[in-house]
Amino acid sequence: MIDEIRKDAETRMKKSIEAFRAELRKIRTGRAHTNLLDHISVTYYGTEVPLNQAASVKVEDARTLSVIPFEKSMVPEVEKAIQSSDLGLTPTTAGTVIRIPMPPLTEDRRKELVKVVRSEAEQARVAIRNIRRDANSDLKELLKEKEISEDEERGGEDAIQKLTDKYTGEVDRILQEKEKELMEI
């Protein structure tokens, strides 16, 4: 019983970390990386599809992405989708290749992004603490139904707290890496 609650809490905490990482991948640093365009979608034969299903995205160099739509007719559609995204990018098209230079981030923009990253980290920490609360309330429920002893409940709560500390520490470590990445010029 206690082990199941602990395993469930750990699985949910891992998912929170993955969701946090996914959110951070969407935040533009000064470097080019293919994940940057993951959340952009284009209209492909009347259906909204993720950009990576309508074009190949490659890193040309540290500050340039190249996007090659699978069909020539999609070039203007893809270019428009990139321009209208919230990333502030200006693509240039040469034939079927769309090049996206990464403009360097201004100091103000870097500070704004650090605030966004910290906010995302706090949301991840809150999610992890909520998982701890749920697990602890499950343990209390088992105690109330006399399925476990008070000592077992305390041991379970300690195990859940150790998991919480481990995963909030992971959030802090990821946050520090991202802040460092954002602040380097």
Curated annotation (Swiss-Prot):
The cross-references to InterPro entries, in alphabetical order and at most eight, read:
Ribosome_recyc_fac, Ribosome_recyc_fac_dom, RRF_sf
One Pfam family name from the record?
RRF
Looking up SUPFAM superfamilies in the UniProt record yields: Ribosome recycling factor, RRF (SSF55194)
Query: In UniProt terms, what function does this protein have?
Result: Responsible for the release of ribosomes from messenger RNA at the termination of protein biosynthesis. May increase the efficiency of translation by recycling ribosomes from one round of translation to another.
Keyword Protein biosynthesis appears in the UniProt entry = yes
Q: Does the keyword Kinase apply?
A: no
The domain of life is Bacteria
Q: Which GO terms describe its cellular component?
A: cytosol
Its annotated compartments are: Cytoplasm
Q: Name one GO biological process term.
A: cytoplasmic translational termination
Matches recorded under HAMAP family: RRF (MF_00040)
Q: Which UniProt keywords apply?
A: Cytoplasm, Protein biosynthesis
Lineage start: Bacteria, Pseudomonadati, Pseudomonadota, Gammaproteobacteria, Chromatiales
PANTHER family associated with the record: MITOCHONDRIAL RIBOSOME RECYCLING FACTOR PSEUDO 1 (PTHR20982:SF3), RIBOSOME RECYCLING FACTOR (PTHR20982)
Per the similarity annotation, which family is this?
Belongs to the RRF family.
Q: Report the protein name in the record.
A: Ribosome-recycling factor
